[in-house]
């Protein structure tokens, strides 16, 4: 398993310019699938090691790194305008849809435009019978996207839109199985398959590069949203929403439900609590004044009748917006839709679903709230303070939106941005909270604050925010900063890099941000002219004339301001549990013996239904591909291995729209063990400290003006068949091909000229890293548990955990004090890391671009390599560290748990076979999904097999259980031995696995994946062999694998991140099963 840890200030534009989830800073976003259930929290981690879908999915499951929440996304600020130009030809493969043809299918053509920014023809249709609007976007992008979006404003915080979003995918009229969604997860080539809930709308998007597969997905989703079984089946509502659980009348009653436990996890995270309070306080008079995701205190108030009525009212074509995008036949799109839409008559639902504007306050509001905190540390230093504004009571014009997004980036977008820099350098807090512009809802919001604030400094933070904004309005911005921001934006637009996220879905979400409010859906897709006008205005009038009035009018002189102070309360989590227990005791006391017996019977009935598999004949109704639709060979990336000045160079000749992508790889093998935990901070220091001639602000601006971004991070992985791990530092950069010389000069400047002399900045890095790790513990405890188990089972896991797990958090606590006591020693250690690692010997350069650019850039690479020093040190260090094998419980203040168990199956003599990937996926999507999520009530449960190390692990996420979940893990071998799958089920599992292996990748991701395979010794021949083994997986392979994974049951280690109460209960039930560590 690859593990990467990046520094906080990564300037990688893959993280900086496209982080889709940045569009939801305050919104609630629910993800329905088992893998997606793990994507939301993981967005707060720091980096992915591969941009691929499969790699992303696998890494997120292990809680590894994706772009930092502190790294600002330009797409966040420009979500309405910065649409990526799809690198396709505009000429469609199919003829246009004529007016007569549309009329025959029941549609009228409302408007039609060629969107040059995405080289696409976009046509807006209206279904004449229902009024449903359809946007049909045609181009040659093979990654086709479909989405249906409903306006779904809740009136309370019972979570009704969220529970419905989970439930409609649990069977429908044409697909009456328990969960057709899971069947699609098992056997589709989807590049995106999910659903999510905003505060005012619910989205159901899918994507695939295979046309047959794509329309299978479309049909299942259309049938699910319009004709779901859940409105007639209370069991689905109980399973996904909430229900009373009573296994025996003598036991206590408990609440169960997937959404209920998901939201318990959400309400255990201080940052999430703050975001919800801010949104609701800013808009108390409309739907944003409640929580669409659901407050755990309110969810049990929701009735099945209200649930059904909400679907009847809002899930109607008249209230829907439908999106198609890609290279498929536009006439076929309408043909498919007409079959569904023609079944309905027009509905008044668009009137009842309209969102009313919140009127601006006449005076500011101040709130003081509590959040659940641990007992460790000085609680008086754990306050949070955030100032929030609702910026307008009317929609902003396009020019103002663009300028506001630009302003947001100038103030907060990089570590050198003035508002961000001043707040973090003030010493008043540890990290930013609620930082920046949020414009995905009807009215834009702006919020900024700090956490880790001392009680006596709370007022000072508010004063500093206001004073800094006044100063920026009065003085304006540095010209270099404005130029750097503009280059950043323009590079982002040209690059069109959405990572593993489908481009068409990015466009859909931007279009829907206006369309859902009955505004022009084309407007968010057209940025060229507004951006050109803004550049012209800045050039003619100066940036101050553009931005200062915005600060003054929308922020400083705006009385619609809500200041929120969050106070730590070590009793809050316990109090909430006691309150819930008291409610349930009263419920039970009010029941008769007959009532209790009936509840126990109903509990058993629900569990029996949940654990009874669908019959094979029912499963056959869910459309799927066959093995004949699957390519027999993997996708090969063109790779030429050569050298420049004696250094190995990998070249990948791919079309990149005149952009050069490069990675320079250095070996960690010679580093002293004691310096390893300093490596992430070393990487951050390279990017965020100045040189002899340049301040870090000047250096940051230079990177923004000349390149598309530079990042530095460590990467570790086991290597199959070897004891020593692969451990590297990777420097990634990108620029226009014509600026490659600037890129390599700046990379050299960062590596060799940055000075480790700024004690106060380094102390900030440590505090920010500690705050970020503490946030990970609360929100992504499964990642912490996985890292901890890996550290017990293999060397690479230990190295990664030292740089990004609980051990790293403990190191940061110690380091915070040491910065004041021994800064000279720390500075010296950072220099020693540089001398040990950043050298020519063992260096590898990876480049991805078109052939001409690769040739032209060689001189720049040669010059860069010539400037690298030779490493005179004495060779590689032997890495042999591991944590002691033991069951461990990490205590945090939480209402839900994260439960893991792992073991090394190679220790049993198991030899890797491609069937292992098929079997692991099948276990996750059947046994663990049914038992841990559906029956157990956890938000997520899955297994993961790291073929490099041999570690097989189980993990659960936002789980109400602990020992019960471990028992489910231990039953997996018996589940496999008792399995009797038919050929159709087996084929589906194989196809789903190939979908992961053949994940859709953009050119930079292809080049990076090829580099990773090179580093790990994975050959194309091995990839072909594994593919053949996947395609020929048999039932016998499942039975044989059962014996291998029994080692996890018999000799595995368990790690839980959980509440003190649940850990105490587990240790009482199984005599000190866990060794306990307190983390927060």
UniProtKB/Swiss-Prot annotation:
Annotated residues for binding of Mg(2+): 705
N-acetylvaline PTM positions: 86
pH-activity relationship: Active from pH 4 to 10.
Effect upon mutating residue 256 to C: Inactive under oxidizing conditions and fully active under reducing conditions
Residue range of the transit peptide in the UniProt record, numbered on this chain: 1-85
Cellular localization per UniProt: Plastid, Chloroplast stroma; Mitochondrion matrix
Enzyme class: hydrolase
Coiled coil residues, start to end: 571-612
Keyword Magnesium: yes
Activity relative to temperature: Optimum temperature is 28 degrees Celsius. Active from 4 to 40 degrees Celsius.
Keyword field contains Acetylation: yes
Record-listed E.C. numbers: 3.4.24.-
Annotated GO MF terms: metal ion binding; metalloendopeptidase activity
Cofactor: Zn(2+); Mg(2+)
SUPFAM superfamilies membership: LuxS/MPP-like metallohydrolase (SSF63411)
Pfam families per UniProt: M16C_assoc, Peptidase_M16, Peptidase_M16_C, PreP_C
Function as written in the Swiss-Prot or TrEMBL entry: ATP-independent protease that degrades both mitochondrial and chloroplastic transit peptides after their cleavage. Also degrades other unstructured peptides. Specific for peptides in the range of 10 to 65 residues. Shows a preference for cleavage after small polar residues and before basic residues, with a bias for positively charged amino acid residues.
Family: Belongs to the peptidase M16 family. PreP subfamily.
Subunit text: Homodimer.
Extra remark beyond the main annotation: The 2 enzymes halves enclose a large proteolytic chamber spacious enough to hold peptide substrates, but sufficiently small to exclude larger, folded proteins. Since the active site includes residues from both the N- and C-terminal part of the protein, proteolysis can occur only when the chamber is closed. Covalently locking the 2 halves of the protease with disulfide bonds induces a loss of activity.
Name of protein: Presequence protease 1, chloroplastic/mitochondrial
Organism name: Arabidopsis thaliana (Mouse-ear cress)
